[in-house]
């Protein structure tokens, strides 16, 4: 998956996850969630964003709120 296609891939994987949720099959939901997470990490890489660092910052914000 190339970087230029990363935004479209995120949208596609999001749609597939929504479909899996609508069907209610746990294994398919897990698979599609994994695909979406991978796509998001690839998109971050394309944007030259450190996905791990971004997640750590968000976790810290979450912990401060609760």
Tell what function each PLM region has:
Residues 1-33, 37-66:
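Flexible "arm" and connector segments at domain edges
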């Amino acid at each position: 998956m190339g970087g230029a296609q990363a935004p479209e891939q995120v949208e596609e994987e999001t749609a597939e996850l929504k479909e899996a949720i609508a069907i209610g099959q746990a294994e398919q939901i897990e698979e599609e969630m994994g695909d979406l997470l991978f796509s998001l990490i690839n998109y971050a890489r394309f944007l030259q964003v450190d996905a791990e660092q971004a997640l750590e910052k968000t976790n810290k914000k979450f912990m401060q709120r609760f």
